[in-house]
Amino acid sequence: MQPSLAPCLICLLVHAAFCAVEGQGWQAFRNDATEVIPGLGEYPEPPPENNQTMNRAENGGRPPHHPYDAKDVSEYSCRELHYTRFLTDGPCRSAKPVTELVCSGQCGPARLLPNAIGRVKWWRPNGPDFRCIPDRYRAQRVQLLCPGGAAPRSRKVRLVASCKCKRLTRFHNQSELKDFGPETARPQKGRKPRPGARGAKANQAELENAY
């Protein structure tokens, strides 16, 4: 009985395949040795990302591609506050309320104030202070109604139209540069000093030298 040649051929082919794989190395096997890719090389691993750029707590809530430089110029401006009130002049009162602009408080960052006006440049975060003060005024004529059947009157008022940020340095707050003492009386022209005052000064000098 002659053995079949098919199993022998299969064994020879498997043996030849294993010999070829051993010559190329075991790195050619992929997917748990179920697929042979002889031309596939090793890919380099990507470098690990820096977690500090992704941490928004360290970047002040800003995206990592928009770094904030403390030396950059940032805008400061006043907050726009409108105040509506009635004008009075004695017993008379305006027929309609008047809306005016109120400038008060410190200047804040313009990016945080959507309705900001009067923008200026702020060069240093720890630099001089800025205050919001009136910049321009507008004149408006208001009609006043008086009680008792009196004829209405008109009055011209001055209202704030815009505000601005004024720079206040440390020089404005130095109290030693200000003279809080009594103002010296200026000598008046055409008048002679009184003799009584001159005698009082002379007597005071004699009393001081007596001891």
UniProtKB/Swiss-Prot annotation:
<dbReference type="GO" id="GO:0009612">
    <property type="term" value="P:response to mechanical stimulus"/>
</dbReference>
<dbReference type="GO" id="GO:0030178">
    <property type="term" value="P:negative regulation of Wnt signaling pathway"/>
</dbReference>
<keyword id="KW-0879">Wnt signaling pathway</keyword>
<keyword id="KW-0272">Extracellular matrix</keyword>
<dbReference type="InterPro" id="IPR008835">
    <property type="entry name" value="Sclerostin/SOSTDC1"/>
</dbReference>
<feature type="glycosylation site" description="N-linked (GlcNAc...) asparagine">
    <location>
        <position position="51"/>
    </location>
</feature>
<feature type="disulfide bond">
    <location>
        <begin position="78"/>
        <end position="132"/>
    </location>
</feature>
<dbReference type="GO" id="GO:0090090">
    <property type="term" value="P:negative regulation of canonical Wnt signaling pathway"/>
</dbReference>
<dbReference type="GO" id="GO:0031333">
    <property type="term" value="P:negative regulation of protein-containing complex assembly"/>
</dbReference>
<dbReference type="GO" id="GO:0140678">
    <property type="term" value="F:molecular function inhibitor activity"/>
</dbReference>
<keyword id="KW-0964">Secreted</keyword>
<comment type="function">
    <text>Negative regulator of bone growth that acts through inhibition of Wnt signaling and bone formation.</text>
</comment>
<feature type="disulfide bond">
    <location>
        <begin position="92"/>
        <end position="146"/>
    </location>
</feature>
<feature type="glycosylation site" description="N-linked (GlcNAc...) asparagine">
    <location>
        <position position="173"/>
    </location>
</feature>
<keyword id="KW-1015">Disulfide bond</keyword>
<dbReference type="GO" id="GO:0005615">
    <property type="term" value="C:extracellular space"/>
</dbReference>
<keyword id="KW-0325">Glycoprotein</keyword>
<dbReference type="Pfam" id="PF05463">
    <property type="entry name" value="Sclerostin"/>
</dbReference>
<dbReference type="GO" id="GO:0001503">
    <property type="term" value="P:ossification"/>
</dbReference>
<dbReference type="GO" id="GO:0032991">
    <property type="term" value="C:protein-containing complex"/>
</dbReference>
<dbReference type="GO" id="GO:0030509">
    <property type="term" value="P:BMP signaling pathway"/>
</dbReference>
<dbReference type="GO" id="GO:0005794">
    <property type="term" value="C:Golgi apparatus"/>
</dbReference>
<dbReference type="GO" id="GO:0030514">
    <property type="term" value="P:negative regulation of BMP signaling pathway"/>
</dbReference>
<dbReference type="InterPro" id="IPR029034">
    <property type="entry name" value="Cystine-knot_cytokine"/>
</dbReference>
<feature type="region of interest" description="Disordered">
    <location>
        <begin position="38"/>
        <end position="68"/>
    </location>
</feature>
<feature type="disulfide bond">
    <location>
        <begin position="107"/>
        <end position="165"/>
    </location>
</feature>
<feature type="disulfide bond">
    <location>
        <begin position="103"/>
        <end position="163"/>
    </location>
</feature>
<comment type="similarity">
    <text>Belongs to the sclerostin family.</text>
</comment>
<feature type="signal peptide">
    <location>
        <begin position="1"/>
        <end position="23"/>
    </location>
</feature>
<dbReference type="GO" id="GO:0008201">
    <property type="term" value="F:heparin binding"/>
</dbReference>
<dbReference type="GO" id="GO:0030279">
    <property type="term" value="P:negative regulation of ossification"/>
</dbReference>
<dbReference type="GO" id="GO:0071374">
    <property type="term" value="P:cellular response to parathyroid hormone stimulus"/>
</dbReference>
<protein>
    <recommendedName>
        <fullName>Sclerostin</fullName>
    </recommendedName>
</protein>
<feature type="region of interest" description="Disordered">
    <location>
        <begin position="176"/>
        <end position="211"/>
    </location>
</feature>
<keyword id="KW-0732">Signal</keyword>
<dbReference type="GO" id="GO:0140297">
    <property type="term" value="F:DNA-binding transcription factor binding"/>
</dbReference>
<dbReference type="GO" id="GO:0045893">
    <property type="term" value="P:positive regulation of DNA-templated transcription"/>
</dbReference>
<comment type="subunit">
    <text>Interacts with LRP4 (via the extracellular domain); the interaction facilitates the inhibition of Wnt signaling. Interacts with LRP5 (via the first two YWTD-EGF repeat domains); the interaction inhibits Wnt-mediated signaling. Interacts with LRP6.</text>
</comment>
<keyword id="KW-0358">Heparin-binding</keyword>
<feature type="domain" description="CTCK">
    <location>
        <begin position="80"/>
        <end position="170"/>
    </location>
</feature>
<dbReference type="GO" id="GO:0060070">
    <property type="term" value="P:canonical Wnt signaling pathway"/>
</dbReference>
